[in-house]
Amino acid sequence: MSTIPENLKYADSHEWVLDNGDGTVTVGITDHAQDLLGDVVYVELPEVGTEVTATEQFSLVESVKAASDIYAPVNGEVIEVNDALNDAPELINEAPFEGAWIAKIKLSNAADLDKLLDAAGYSATIA
């Protein structure tokens, strides 16, 4: 059974979103997604300064099984990326909700968060 923290929001494309409370969010992929992918061997990080659009591809995760596009769950600008994933992509498997965030995004519109699923809603999509 996948871990689904209650304090996060979720996209049905398996990204999690942490509202940092300052107009920014932290984004990663869910435990369910990393489990489906298997051992992650590479993460293509977005460029800082990139404008992202909700539901459009902004990153890529490659595993021993497959390559999977990662979709922006909100509209905004990438303000920071997790460079630790360049040297340790396996963090996605080991700690998908802690050390393995992919990017921090400055929201264009805070209302985007209202369009995301809560933990119960996400749990229902993967049941």
Swiss-Prot record:
The glycine cleavage system is composed of four proteins: P, T, L and H. It comes from Marinomonas sp. (strain MWYL1). The keyword Nucleus does not apply. Residues 24-106 form the Lipoyl-binding domain. The modification N6-lipoyllysine is found at residue 65. The glycine cleavage system catalyzes the degradation of glycine. The H protein shuttles the methylamine group of glycine from the P protein to the T protein. Keywords: Lipoyl. It comes from the Bacteria. The gene is gcvH. CDD domains: GCS_H (cd06848). This is Glycine cleavage system H protein. One of its GO terms (biological process) is glycine decarboxylation via glycine cleavage system. Belongs to the GcvH family. Binds 1 lipoyl cofactor covalently. It holds the Pfam family GCV_H. GO terms for cellular component: cytosol; glycine cleavage complex. InterPro entries: 2-oxoA_DH_lipoyl-BS (IPR003016), Biotin_lipoyl (IPR000089), GCV_H (IPR002930), GCV_H/Fam206 (IPR033753), GCV_H_sub (IPR017453), Single_hybrid_motif (IPR011053). Its cofactor is (R)-lipoate.
